[in-house]
Amino acid sequence: MASLYDNEAKIKQAIIMLQKIVNDTSVPRNIRRAATDAIRNLQDSSLSPAVRAANAIGILEEISQDPNMPTHTRISIWNVVSMLETVKD
């Protein structure tokens, strides 16, 4: 059960990091929208933590290729993806 709590803690930390991106007005709107979608996926309690993380990773990896993304935002997204990749069932 400790693993479940670790996974939930990682997901909560990822949500906090993504909320910072959503609230940053220097980030283009489409990237903020993708971060909001990733947060929504992470908060979907009907799915297991690993599935929620995988869904969010898919959204974030797709948007991380956007050439309009500020460098600091890209690094934050990579950090979130790295954290979510460690979430396992």
From Swiss-Prot:
Chain segments annotated as coiled-coil in the UniProt record: none
Membrane-crossing residue ranges in chain numbering: none
Superkingdom of origin organism: Archaea
Family, similarity comment: Belongs to the UPF0147 family.
Protein name: UPF0147 protein STK_04605
